[in-house]
């Protein structure tokens, strides 16, 4: 028999009854039932009930065991007594009668329990992550993550993609987020950077004659804490293709992402046909460029019904051409209590309130707005929104560029409060036609709105002849349930177009050469049309595991202060290490 086990803790079945077996694992739970000692032994594969009575030669050893001790148990498999089966366990019909116990690794007093999975402070969980990872839910999430990544790889290869690995030590690229810098010992005063993404390398691969690249790529960004991204590093399914259009990217990636979601959806519906929503339409209908399409609410511009109306606040606003009034329909929300609750919520969000109209029996409009604009306009709004008795509509007004974020939050709130959101589906969609540029109010200049290497719709002619803020790019996102899970674009592959695109954003040609010299040189020697995307592995896994916390699907994450509490990073280093790197610290005194 093997030194440590003949079977795993998840393997034993009725067919093993009367066999002598050996299992090893952790003491998950120990119960004393009137002289009978029950030990639930756990390993990576499952859990087996082991039992010792006072007649067992191992009883005294069993009495000494404590939670999370690692032990080896020899014994005989037997049928559980009638009425004690556990249908929740694959091993739930059998137990091991213990004949011998060997302690392989005793455990001290636990800083957090493994059994029971009680809520514990996050910093404790991260400091003792090796204990936290023994807990069933987190352990299963990590296994699911591995299976999802395997599925991605398999499906990418089925689509004809090849996996490549690009460098981890690269040059600093000042655009975007801050880089993690790595000082060079050999080249004093010079630094490598960890890649924020393999963007330039994957484009260089296409210029090197390769096609259909992918990798599960680690990405590093020295960003301030964000609720929707882990500090430090994250992983993406990185993709690039040559001689393709936007349609080719969609055709290649839809089956991959749909297939992964269908495989791990656990009974939830996954739409096989993805809507394609222009960016401007997404913002107007949903108040977000990553709309949650499980929520059926679509906002509408109802400005015409308030222009010149008796509701002077909106009527005066609409005298300014850029201002609009948007309506958020709320099916089933036509109660005074609900409307007052939404108004209070809006005030909590820093707004003066949230105007509303309710419709009662006979489709009669009610509320301050209805009283001010009159029955004819109220009825026109009801018809436009497709509402009836028992429904309500909420209104936001002003410059859409300023209120759109709040409008999106209000749409989400109404949908959730009225239980309109279908929690049993994954609603996937493309968002397309992103603006190439946006106006940076802080710096008073035009900036790239997304990826600076994307191709403008209309090419060089658009860059030369159009208002930059009207130029659309061949850029696209994949959204799911209110999350952006992928982003990509068709690339600028002509050097003159690349230089012009950067010039509009305030970069001179020499600055482009200095910052992106490798790619700029490659453009001079025959660059194919190419494009791709990157899908967020962490977010996809988070959605499929049914959690809203990225730390629940990551092995050893940092906390929100970008600290690894288990390994003690970031840490001080020795003066000798600093001297070797030609670094002198200049820290502010506390």
Curated annotation (Swiss-Prot):
SUPFAM superfamilies: Class II aaRS and biotin synthetases (SSF55681), GAD domain-like (SSF55261), Nucleic acid-binding proteins (SSF50249)
Localization: Cytoplasm
First-listed, main subcellular location of the protein, grouped into a coarse class: cytoplasm
UniProt xrefs under PROSITE patterns: AA_TRNA_LIGASE_II
Listed InterPro entries: Aa-tRNA-synt_II, aa-tRNA-synth_II, aa-tRNA-synth_II/BPL/LPL, Asp-tRNA-ligase_1, Asp-tRNA-ligase_1_N, Asp/Asn-tRNA-synth_IIb, AspRS_core, GAD-like_sf
Site label Important for tRNA non-discrimination, positions: 33, 83
Homology family: Belongs to the class-II aminoacyl-tRNA synthetase family. Type 1 subfamily.
Function recorded in the entry: Aspartyl-tRNA synthetase with relaxed tRNA specificity since it is able to aspartylate not only its cognate tRNA(Asp) but also tRNA(Asn). Reaction proceeds in two steps: L-aspartate is first activated by ATP to form Asp-AMP and then transferred to the acceptor end of tRNA(Asp/Asn).
Subunit structure and binding partners: Homodimer.
Protein name per UniProt: Aspartate--tRNA(Asp/Asn) ligase
Taxonomic source organism: Rhodopseudomonas palustris (strain BisA53)
